[in-house]
Structures are given as structure tokens and as C-alpha cells.
Amino acid sequence: MMDLAEKLEILADSAKYDVACTSSGVDRPGRHGALGSSAAAGICHAFTADGRCVSLLKVLYSNVCSYDCSYCVNRRSNDRPRATFTPRELAELTIGFYRRNYIEGLFLSSAVLGTPDRTMELMIEALRILREEYHFNGYIHAKTIPGADPMLVEKIGRLADRLSVNIELPSETSLTTLAPDKKKTAILRPMGQIAVQSAQSKKEMVLYRGAKPFAPAGQSTQMIIGATPETDRHIMDLTEGLYRKYSLKRVFYSAYLPVVEDRRLPALHTAPPLLREHRLYQADWLLRYYHFSARELLTEDEPNFDPYLDPKCTWAVRHPEFFPVEVNTASRAELLRVPGIGPKSALRIVEARRVQSLGMAELKRIGVVLKRAQYFITCKGKAATRGSRAEIAGALLDPKAFSVGMQQLSLDDFVPKALPDAAPAVQRLEARGMAADVAARTVRQEALQCLTKRM
């Protein structure tokens, strides 16, 4: 008979591949006489809409799955330890952690235990016990199981603060190939239901005092990138459509980490495309807060993001006709197109110039990143800097693409090592035997020359 601690260890570990909230990845057990523990028992962090960081218990209800998705560590044919909570076990575990001040909420997902309806019924019962018997008022993020009855989606939406339905892969073709048990329509249907009921609930909350909220923190989704051949342009078009049609709060991107051997997937030794994931998040930010469109960021000729430039700088290099921008007269929308100017600094510029004309000194105090912005703006009609093309290119290159750390081989022996999110070209040269720092310098020089020619 498996005890609760064993179940927690298995089901917290099985939940770590879901990126809708983040974990540290540390697995240092507690010690007698010491305060605290960083054991990998499912404690992770998420950020609320107002910027607060909350600690969540991140677990699966069960990792016993009736589906056989090729990319999933919990797939039916994979030989691994299996466990399932009972609704009361999960509720008592959550409330126990909450009372000890370990967590502020719960992130709950599950493998498909038998059928989607059966899985959702068990998850709902666990949340009902938490809310109604223990009067738990903390944050709950629940994953909706595609294919479940709409009535069950409504029930879980009344108990959870946020819902999410994972879109899994960027195209229906990839979904059919790697996850034949899942259907695109079964994923999109609950997304549409959640969007409609969430909007309706907000109206009811205004009109009726006793109205019950439905997923008041909205919904999100997650997709795996790097396991299938879709371009970044395809992914951003999909993302833009999801935000527009389903009013999503977030789309999360998960760089594919090979965990199972399958001829349809990248080999087990393949490094996850972390830099590509980073570029997608940067582009996602541009869609949500900078008012870019997906088709502005990528073209048919260049359907993937530049590994050496962030998407905003890439757009600026492609559109010299837009610059320079006069900071004392430009609209907020125009300011947001300038590399080095973000939403907060753009708003501060608009407010500050009502009082006085702005120069470089004022922009620096406002928070503008002048290292990049100085090449794209004028202040009172004067260009801030007239750098050479090579100087401008050097200022725009993303240092993250050439990131190198130090790896300790022995007490006195340290060697440079390319970090996991360095550009693929750096990692390839290192794999061929070149020192990581030399590889980074070589790739940076080549990228600099290439960018200088484009400008």
C-alpha cells in the first residue's frame, strides 16, 4: 500500500513538465536541526495579474493515463511508477501545506484516468472538499481535461480561480501524429466555453450581488515547441488567434525536453530549444503589450526568429523607414516600437514631456535603455548618437545568445561551458571540441558581420 508521501513524490515529479507555473528544480532534502527544505515535492511559483508571486502546490491528481501521447512521460506504454490520490487525500494534503504556510494555493492537473469525465469528476470532488468543507479561499489553478462534459467544465470553473486547456502542439497534423487519442475540436470546445462563461460571469457579478464567479482569473494554455516542424511564424499566428478568439490571459511555451525514445521525436540527447522558447515569449510580450501583430514580426521569407536578436530589434532593423522617432512628439504607440523603450518608460515619456522637453539625461532617468534606444530616436530634432553600423549591430545583439558559464571539474579546475539557452551554433561548435568561450566569440563575430551587412 503506497503512503501519501510516496504518492506526493511521484505525482509532483510527474507534474514538473507543465510550465504554466515554474519550479526551481532543486532537490535538496531537509536536514535535522536545520530550517527549511527545498525537496522536490511540488512547491512552485506563479505570478498573479497584479505582480504578486504566490507559492503553489503543483501536482497531478493521477499519472495513470489511458492515452499514449508520444511526447509524454506519463503515456500509457511508458514503464514508470504510477499513483493516484483520492479526493480527500489531495484536499487534506493541500490544506495541511496551507496551514503550515508552505503554499498559498494549488495547481492541479491530471493524466486521463479512465475517461475525461471520470477524471474531471474526481478533480472536482477534491476541489469541492477544499472549498466547501475546509473553506479554503486560496488560489486554485485547474487543468480542464479535453473531451469532458461541458457541465463538468462549468462545475470546475465555479471552484477554480483559473482554468487552462493545453493545446499541446502547434498544428492538428502534429497532434494527430503524436497524440492520436486527442482531437483539436475536443481541445478548442472547452476553451470556447470557458471564454463565453467567464465573460458572462463578469457581467453577472456586476448585476447580481449573489452571483458566483466562474474562473475569475481567466484561462491559459500551453504548447510544446521543438518536437514538431512548425515554424515560429505558424506558432505566433496560432497564438494571436488564441488571444483574440478565446480571450486567453497567457500562452505558455514549453521547449521540448526528450524524455522518451520515439522515432517521430528528437533523439534523447537533443538539447531543448531554450533560446527559441525565450524568443517566443519575447514575441508573445510584443503581441500583448506592444501592439505588434504576428505578421509584422515574421515573414514568409524569414519565418523563424533570429537567434542573435530579440524580435523587437529584428523588426527595427527591417524597418529603417520608421526611424528616427522624435521622443517629444511621437505617440505612445510609436514610442513602443523603439528598441529600449517599454510600456512603462513610454508612458513616463508621454507624461513627462507635458512639463518639459526631454533630452538624453531625462530619458535615462525615466528608465529608457539608451544603449539600444539612442540609435533610433531624436531629442528636440537632434540625433542622440551617430554610431557606425558595426557599433549599432554590437549594441543590438542579445548577449543571452552567447552566454557561457563555468563548470567545475575538480577543486581547482574550472572550464567554460555554454549555458543551456545559448545559441544552437555555440552549442554545436562546443560539441565538436571547441572551447565554449571561443565558440561564443566566434559565433558572435559572425553574427555581428551578418547583421552589419543587413543594416
Description of each model-found segment:
Residues 1-64, 369, 377, 385-455:
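Flexible, acidic/Gly-rich N-terminal and inter-domain linker regions that tether
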Residues 1-67, 71-221, 226-229, 242, ...:
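Conserved Radical SAM active-site core
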Residues 176, 188-195, 226-311:
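A structural motif corresponding to the C-terminal lobe/cap of the Radical SAM core domain
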Residues 264-336, 372-421, 454-455:
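Long, highly charged, low-complexity intrinsically disordered interaction regions
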Residues 352-353:
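Residue-level signature of tetratricopeptide-repeat
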Residues 361-365, 374:
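Short Lys/Arg-enriched helix C-cap and helix-to-coil transition segments
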